[in-house]
């Protein structure tokens, strides 16, 4: 999330994005993790999960900013997949995840901005979709990846 959102309630962060008046919103290289996301992802990786990152950015320049944040905060290593002028079906075909965890995109229009709802039926049938509240974090998701695979939003 953008750095000026730190310490604010989720609903205020969403409103900041909707209003778009804070410069830190578009300063992607200065983004900060939400909650204990690094610990959670590391826990899953230690159980054998391969961590893949999906970026909403379509330019390599902005994806590089995502890389800066991932390295700065010691996120588990993993490739970053992004649209590259293609739709999400192509991105998912390239990444081939088992589970997709994404936020509900509340501040930018909701479901039509999300990945899973815009996939074809074939991919929807293959993937486990977990939707979290935007800026809500993943701390409440199970630490055990076998339980995560059974989780339903």
Task: Cite the ranges covered by each PLM segment.
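Alpha-helical substrate-recognition element adjacent to the catalytic core
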Residues: 1-82
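C-terminal cap/substrate-recognition subdomain and adjoining C-terminal extension
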Residues: 45-50, 58-153
